[in-house]
A protein has these predicted regions:
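A detector for small-residue-rich transmembrane helices and their helix-helix packing motifs
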Residues: 1-163
């Protein structure tokens, strides 16, 4: 596929939906069998990272509930469409996955570190969802200045806020 297509966004939406369906089915299977923890083992990125290493990838496409899925889907369409139109399908998917995986790993490591400090009331946390990938797309849009002539270019700041 050549540049200028929104197809990668549609593909990701389909992947999100398929993974969510698998999560629901795995949850049902875990509830009626002795497979408690199946969904977490397949999709939730949690410390220690080496225990279920595939979750570095699968957690990017999984979601906690339907609201989480829908909010990430809307953000993906808003921020992903301009990026998808500016790059190739392969680069778009690779960028999204790397941003999402890196964000998840950093969040898990950061909360694990903070939980070890006596002055911080923090617990090591588990993560899942496409927010890291979506924010990576937003960062790309802001850093590449693609928004300046369209959305962000039409917003004027008061003199006190401008640099």
């Amino acid at each position: 596929m050549e540049n200028g297509s929104g197809t990668p966004v549609i593909e990701l939406l389909l992947v999100f939906s398929a993974v969510f369906a698998i999560q629901v089915l795995a949850g049902i299977a875990a509830a009626i069998t002795s497979l408690a923890g199946l969904v977490d083992a397949l999709f939730v990125l949690a410390p220690p990272l080496g225990e279920n290493p595939w979750t570095v990838v699968t957690s990017v496409y999984a979601h906690a509930d339907l609201g989480h899925l829908l909010s990430n889907a809307v953000a993906l369409v808003v921020f992903g469409w301009p990026v998808a139109r500016a790059t190739t399908r392969t680069r778009f998917h690779a960028f999204f996955l790397v941003c999402g995986a890196l964000a998840g790993v950093v969040q898990v490591l950061t909360t694990a570190f903070l939980a070890g400090l006596p002055i911080v009331a923090a617990e090591p946390t588990a993560v899942l969802g496409a927010s890291g990938g979506v924010f990576g797309l937003l960062g790309y849009l802001l850093a590449s200045n693609r928004l300046s002539s369209s959305i962000a270019g039409s917003v004027s700041l008061p003199p006190l806020l401008s640099v």
